[in-house]
């Protein structure tokens, strides 16, 4: 099901910049907007701003295609892809994703189908190879008129006395250069270029984790229409993802306490397999698995920046905040914030007096969505959440609201947000009931080793 993207976004109503205005701007700056980073967030912002007639230059540290995790999109990505004009191309390279499933202690899995989401808009998403997906978006930004420079590392961003910024960078050959811009959008992801330079980045003390992951062939898929599901398995000290990709490949990874990962002895591929197989159900699906390429490991520390923007600059996606990816929120939050940022920057360049108000509203909305995901993330491995996910009930449409959250509908849908408040109450009541019931023999979590 597709819906009109204009129903979900504040469309840009103003006209393109006039020739006289552009001529005056050209005298002072090399470009109107400088975007740092060529991932989904950067490409989204660059596409939409270039389409509006602004001069956009994007600097990307690497050369595409390149490997990246974060391969599971959400249904709420679809209207953004449609707005960009790439939905059909993404569908062609992606694996159809109708649901997310969470295996229970009894070995059965519960499939949370997106077509049951409260206020359903789009009833599916796609699993994508990020190398293909990110390159597609970057090439589309070029086609829309953005000036793309790959293998270009940003070294510093300095405010100019006459307004705007001077961005110093260096190419792969070591040659230095600079570009002046009226506005800077930091879409550098976990590089957090401006967050680090301005001293804004703050680690979340309770959200410490690390990830190990790889691609495999021979991993069994869910039967029938569930074949494209993302599966999330619980471990005693973390969780496992399985994301089905094209050509029979399965992305498999584990997110665990970093202290557990420090216990590793021997090869990373063996450690990854042993960790994943710490869940009995995951072990069964990995019985015939063959690793494709080399496994990788990365720190997965959650953080946020103290500020989201200032005069002439703005953070989007992971450049502002990063949360545990258990609900596949990363690419959606990146692209959604980038689309909103494009609207904000367009309006600010036309009327700078609006910037403070627009940035305040932008941050309030993004923090609201991050807060909804974070509340569930912090409680995912608790006995209470395990009980509620294994025994879902749709009283007052609460289950449908949780599915809407899993679909990414965490910003503006009031019926969903109201019922998520009810879910929090149900969680508290369930926690009290479990405490009053007293200790009892713990059920098998089927997560023995990790």
Kindly label every feature range from the protein language model:
Residues 50-69:
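Glycine-rich FAD pyrophosphate-binding loop
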Residues 118-139, 262-267:
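Short beta-strand to alpha-helix junction loop
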Residues 25-39:
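Beta1/beta-strand and adjacent pyrophosphate-binding region of the FAD-binding site
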Residues 42-43:
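N-terminal Rossmann-fold NAD(P) dinucleotide-binding loop
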Residues 140-282:
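Predominantly flavin-linked oxidoreductase catalytic cores and closely associated redox partners
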Residues 68-106:
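N-terminal FAD cofactor-binding segment of flavoenzymes
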Residues 4, 10, 343-450:
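C-terminal helical "tail/cap" subdomain of flavin- and related membrane-associated enzymes
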């Amino acid at each position: 099901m597709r819906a009109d993207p204009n129903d979900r976004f504040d469309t840009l109503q103003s006209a393109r910049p006039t020739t006289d205005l552009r001529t005056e701007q050209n005298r002072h700056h090399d470009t109107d907007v400088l975007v740092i980073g060529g991932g989904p967030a950067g490409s989204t912002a660059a596409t939409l701003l270039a389409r509006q007639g602004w001069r956009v230059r994007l600097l990307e540290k690497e050369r595409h295609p390149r490997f990246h995790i974060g391969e599971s999109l959400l249904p709420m990505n679809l209207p953004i892809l449609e707005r960009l004009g790439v939905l059909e191309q993404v569908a062609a390279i992606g694996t159809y994703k109708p649901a997310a499933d969470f295996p229970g202690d009894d070995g059965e899995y519960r499939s949370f189908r997106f077509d049951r989401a409260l206020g359903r808009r789009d009833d599916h998403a796609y699993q994508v190879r990020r190398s293909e997906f990110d390159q597609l978006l970057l090439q589309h930004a070029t086609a829309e008129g953005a000036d793309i420079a790959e293998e270009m590392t940003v070294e510093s961003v300095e405010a100019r006395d006459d307004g705007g910024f001077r961005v110093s960078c260096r190419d792969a050959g070591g040659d230095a250069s600079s570009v002046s811009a009226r506005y800077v959008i930091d879409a550098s992801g976990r590089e957090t270029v401006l967050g680090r330079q301005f001293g804004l980045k703050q680690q979340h003390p309770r959200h410490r984790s690390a990830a190990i992951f790889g691609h495999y062939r021979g991993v069994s898929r869910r039967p029938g229409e569930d074949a494209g599901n993302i599966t999330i398995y619980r471990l005693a000290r973390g969780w496992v993802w399985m994301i089905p990709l094209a050509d029979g490949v399965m992305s498999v990874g584990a997110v665990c306490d970093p202290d557990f990962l420090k216990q590793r002895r021997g090869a990373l591929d063996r450690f990854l397999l042993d960790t994943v197989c710490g869940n009995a159900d995951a072990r069964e699906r990995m019985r015939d698995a063959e690793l494709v390429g080399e496994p990788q490991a990365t720190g997965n520390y959650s953080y946020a920046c103290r500020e989201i923007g200032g005069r002439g600059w703005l953070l989007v996606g992971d450049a502002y905040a990063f949360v545990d990816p258990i609900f596949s929120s990363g690419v959606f939050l990146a692209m959604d914030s980038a689309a909103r940022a494009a609207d904000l920057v367009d309006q600010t360049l036309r009327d700078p007096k609006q910037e403070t108000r627009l940035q305040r509203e932008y941050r309030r909305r993004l923090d609201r969505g991050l807060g909804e995901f974070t509340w569930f993330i912090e409680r995912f491995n608790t006995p209470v959440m395990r009980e509620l996910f294994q025994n879902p009930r749709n009283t007052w449409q609460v289950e449908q609201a949780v599915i809407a959250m899993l679909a990414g509908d965490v910003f503006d849908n009031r019926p969903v947000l109201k019922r998520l408040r009810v879910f929090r109450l149900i969680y508290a009541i369930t926690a009290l009931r479990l405490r009053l019931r007293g200790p009892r023999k713990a059920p098998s979590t089927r997560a023995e080793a990790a």
